[in-house]
UniProtKB/Swiss-Prot annotation:
Protein name: Multifunctional CCA protein
Record function comment: Catalyzes the addition and repair of the essential 3'-terminal CCA sequence in tRNAs without using a nucleic acid template. Adds these three nucleotides in the order of C, C, and A to the tRNA nucleotide-73, using CTP and ATP as substrates and producing inorganic pyrophosphate. tRNA 3'-terminal CCA addition is required both for tRNA processing and repair. Also involved in tRNA surveillance by mediating tandem CCA addition to generate a CCACCA at the 3' terminus of unstable tRNAs. While stable tRNAs receive only 3'-terminal CCA, unstable tRNAs are marked with CCACCA and rapidly degraded.
Family: Belongs to the tRNA nucleotidyltransferase/poly(A) polymerase family. Bacterial CCA-adding enzyme type 1 subfamily.
SUPFAM superfamilies xref list: Nucleotidyltransferase, Poly A polymerase C-terminal region-like
Record note on cofactor: Magnesium is required for nucleotidyltransferase activity.
Binding site for Mg(2+): D21, D23
Organism placement in taxonomy: Bacteria, Pseudomonadati, Pseudomonadota, Betaproteobacteria, Burkholderiales
InterPro entries named in the record: CCA_bact, HD_domain, NT_sf, PolA_pol_head_dom, PolyA_RNA-bd, tRNA_CCA-adding_enzyme
Length: 413
């Protein structure tokens, strides 16, 4: 039995970046031998085991053969006679098809095993497929795009990009299960430069298949006085990258991605103006989230940001009454943490514009001050002083919040 560290752990160590994934391949072993050494089986389709002490994953060396469309359409073969090179040959990219032997005490020993010249591609900053078997798994299209978001200075080899385009043309991207699409998109959004993921997906044609609502944004003009970058797709990518640079959460980054979807449906005769795009964005976000089974916290923030981002940008012109109505519509009084994420998404929108990434956004501080004041109103005490008239209570609480916001803004100014 020989154990090897493979894939991302070797790649990241060679790049000098923190190792995010540790995967191990076991050559020359049977499931029974693994169990006898205390490893716990967890794999459904092929033998994967958890180490008894570290709980890291160890997989038996295997080969695979495509038997049907989609992510699950594979038949696996594993046996003690499967070699390390055979296991590495089934991997997606040359930079992920390297290994080093692991000693009994867990340290890496010996040279890097690199049958497909992954080290050369690392030096050249190139994503290159290992073999034509790449076409058998459409998830690999999404994975390359996600890697591009992590390693923004890498490019996709011409022959690999051509292969990805052929896969898309053959309908392989249409066979992707929604949960896996969301998983990869979400992981890419959380990388350092999410826009690179969408660049790669656009280049191979996959974005139009998995996120047509986003793909439609490129080529849609905006007013240059508000958006020096003009193109809506370019703007949205700048917004997402700004949110990533600030380290914002996945819900904020997803809201950044989707806040302007409605601009793609603006009638051509009114361009570059986009009156009413907020409501149209909401109507596109709903089915998108249902289709990809987007988590509720991401969907809910995306919807409220899409609906209200224009209003948040205009809060310097709003009085106390309008601010309180905004808080009530956006449920900020009950969910201040979500409202804080709304501010982050809207700040990203304001600064995700050509040459404006450091412009002041005083709207955020005005809203923070106003919300603290509105939430300081003791609705329970007001209710007790009025009795059982629900409408009268609601009106009194509303007016008290307006008064509190007026006072707070007067002090702040």
């Amino acid at each position: 039995m020989n154990i090897y560290a493979v894939g991302g752990a070797i790649r990241d160590a060679l790049l000098g970046v923190p190792v995010q994934d540790r995967d191990y391949v076991v050559v020359g072993a049977t499931p029974e031998q693994m169990a006898a050494q205390g490893f716990r089986p967890v794999g459904k389709d092929f033998p994967v085991f958890l180490h008894p002490d570290t709980q890291e994953e160890y997989a038996l060396a295997r080969t695979e053969r495509k038997t049907a469309a989609g992510y699950h359409g594979f038949q696996f073969y594993y046996a003690p006679d499967v070699t390390l090179d055979e296991d590495l040959a089934r991997r997606d990219l040359t930079i992920n098809a390297m290994a080093r032997e692991v000693s009994p005490d867990g340290t890496l020993i010996g040279p890097v095993i690199d049958p497909f010249d992954g080290q050369a591609d690392l030096r050249a900053r190139v994503f290159r497929h290992v073999s034509d078997a790449f076409v058998e798994d459409p998830v690999r299209i999404l994975r390359i795009a996600r890697f591009a978001a992590r390693f923004a200075d890498f490019t996709v080899a011409d022959e690999t990009l051509a292969l990805m385009r052929r896969m898309v043309d053959a309908g392989e991207a249409d066979a992707l299960v929604p949960e896996r699409v969301w998983q990869e998109i979400a992981r890419g959004l959380m990388e350092a430069t999410p826009s690179r993921m969408f660049d790669v997906l656009r280049e191979c044609g996959a974005l139009a298949r998995v996120l047509p609502e986003v793909d439609a944004l490129w080529g849609v003009p905006q007013r240059a006085d508000y958006h020096p970058e003009v193109d809506t797709g370019v703007h949205v990518m700048m917004v997402v990258d700004y949110a990533a640079k600030q380290g914002y959460s996945l819900p904020v980054r997803f809201a950044a991605l989707t806040h302007d979807l409605g601009k793609a449906t603006t009638p051509a005769d009114v361009l570059p103006r986009h009156v009413g795009h907020e409501g149209r964005s909401v109507e596109l976000i709903k089915p998108l989230c249902e289709r990809l089974r987007v988590p509720n916290e991401c969907r809910d923030l995306a919807l409220v940001v899409a609906r209200e981002h224009g209003n948040l940008h205009r809060v310097m012109e709003m009085g106390a009454a309008a601010l309180v109505r905004l808080f009530e519509r956006s449920d900020a009084l009950r969910k201040p943490a979500r409202f804080a994420e709304m501010l982050q998404a809207c700040e990203s929108d304001a600064r995700g514009r050509l040459g404006l990434d450091t412009q002041p956004y005083p709207q955020a501080e005005r809203l923070r001050v106003a919300l603290v004041a509105a939430r300081s109103v003791d609705a329970g005490a007001i209710a007790r002083g009025i009795g059982n008239d629900a409408m009268q209570i609601k009106d009194a609480v509303h007016r008290a919040r307006i008064d509190a916001v007026k006072q707070a803004l007067a002090i702040a100014e």
